[in-house]
Amino acid sequence: MNYAGEPLMNEDEDDKSKELPIGKETEANLFKSRSIFIYGGITQELAQKVCTQLVALAAASDDDIRVYVNSPGGHVESGDSIHDMIKFIKPKVYIIGTGWVASAGALIYVSVPKERRLCLPNTRFLLHQPSGGTRGMASDIEIQAREIIKMNQRLIKIFSKATGQTEEKIAKDIDRDYWLSADDAKDYGLVGKIVESQSEL
């Protein structure tokens, strides 16, 4: 099921063929700095890559890990996988939001306690209900609808616990696209600290 936001301006879909390759030296430096980047749509492939990196870093050391998130959202279950893996490993993970942190990206963002949730000043956040589409028999459509409702209820509980807002307020807010600036997100309980430079991490 999808859980993604739409950009305010029309943009071409990401084309994997246009992605810039990361050299071995850059990968080695990222590993040494214990940094992971979650940029772009949340997919099964991205989840596999990120979870593999998390486990590898955890095996190498108990030192803190930094995860940078800039995502429009995507596949909910893939977001769940990253969310749960961040909680599963032993090292403390700090998450830094940048650009926009939307939908399934926000689900990943709240996988750590508020004091370890940071963002850059111009980051925007988007919370909303999951969506899904199915074709086929009426019974299949009914099953899909029930699953979306259950997923929405689960996400409401997650964001309520993460922000300190009541489940009723979360449910009301995400009835439509709910956008927050960095300052709004901090007031809402989504962000622990807004940072402007690496020295503040």
Swiss-Prot record:
Keywords: Cytoplasm, Hydrolase, Protease, Serine protease. GO terms for molecular function: ATP-dependent peptidase activity; ATPase binding; serine-type endopeptidase activity. Its EC number is 3.4.21.92. GO terms for biological process: protein quality control for misfolded or incompletely synthesized proteins. It catalyses: Hydrolysis of proteins to small peptides in the presence of ATP and magnesium. alpha-casein is the usual test substrate. In the absence of ATP, only oligopeptides shorter than five residues are hydrolyzed (such as succinyl-Leu-Tyr-|-NHMec, and Leu-Tyr-Leu-|-Tyr-Trp, in which cleavage of the -Tyr-|-Leu- and -Tyr-|-Trp bonds also occurs). The keyword Hydrolase applies. It is an enzyme of class 3 (hydrolase). Coiled coil: none annotated. GO terms for cellular component: cytoplasm; endopeptidase Clp complex. The keyword Cytoplasm applies. The active site is at S103 (nucleophile), H128. CDD domains: S14_ClpP_2. It is found in: Cytoplasm. Its main location: cytoplasm. It comes from the Bacteria. Cleaves peptides in various proteins in a process that requires ATP hydrolysis. Has a chymotrypsin-like activity. Plays a major role in the degradation of misfolded proteins. Fourteen ClpP subunits assemble into 2 heptameric rings which stack back to back to give a disk-like structure with a central cavity, resembling the structure of eukaryotic proteasomes. Belongs to the peptidase S14 family. This is ATP-dependent Clp protease proteolytic subunit 3. The lineage of its organism: Bacteria, Pseudomonadati, Pseudomonadota, Alphaproteobacteria, Hyphomicrobiales.
